Amino acid sequence: MSFKPLYDRIAIKPIEHEEKTKGGIIIPDTAKEKPMQGEVVAVGKGVRNEKGEVHPLELKVGDKVLYGKWAGTEIKVKGEDLIVMKESDVFGIIN
């Protein structure tokens, strides 16, 4: 199964953070913060305006982005965890 978002939605692969502290303590899954950075892996075609014209999305596949802690819906595609959200839920692109 592959996944293609519709309209103004994007699919993001979260960038996982280190699972150990600097002191060597392993952080259990239940105590981990939800990652708020990720890489765009798929984008929709955009939304239609009042004239019926498609307004394309600004984000592109491969962009590294910063998003809200509770943004989007988590899904699993081919065993890979993804987050689907609207482009407007993204705060910005990380250079």
From Swiss-Prot:
InterPro entries: Chaperonin_GroES (IPR020818), Chaperonin_GroES_sf (IPR037124), Chaprnonin_Cpn10_CS (IPR018369), GroES-like_sf (IPR011032). Gene3D superfamilies: GroES chaperonin. SMART domains: Cpn10. GO terms for molecular function: ATP binding; metal ion binding; protein folding chaperone; protein-folding chaperone binding; unfolded protein binding. It comes from the Bacteria. GO terms for cellular component: cytoplasm. Keywords: Chaperone, Cytoplasm. It is found in: Cytoplasm. GO terms for biological process: chaperone cofactor-dependent protein refolding. Together with the chaperonin GroEL, plays an essential role in assisting protein folding. The GroEL-GroES system forms a nano-cage that allows encapsulation of the non-native substrate proteins and provides a physical environment optimized to promote and accelerate protein folding. GroES binds to the apical surface of the GroEL ring, thereby capping the opening of the GroEL channel. Belongs to the GroES chaperonin family. PANTHER family: 10 KDA HEAT SHOCK PROTEIN, 20 KDA CHAPERONIN, CHLOROPLASTIC. Heptamer of 7 subunits arranged in a ring. Interacts with the chaperonin GroEL. NCBIfam families: PRK00364.1-2, PRK00364.1-5, PRK00364.2-2, PRK00364.2-4. This is Co-chaperonin GroES. It comes from Rickettsia bellii (strain OSU 85-389).
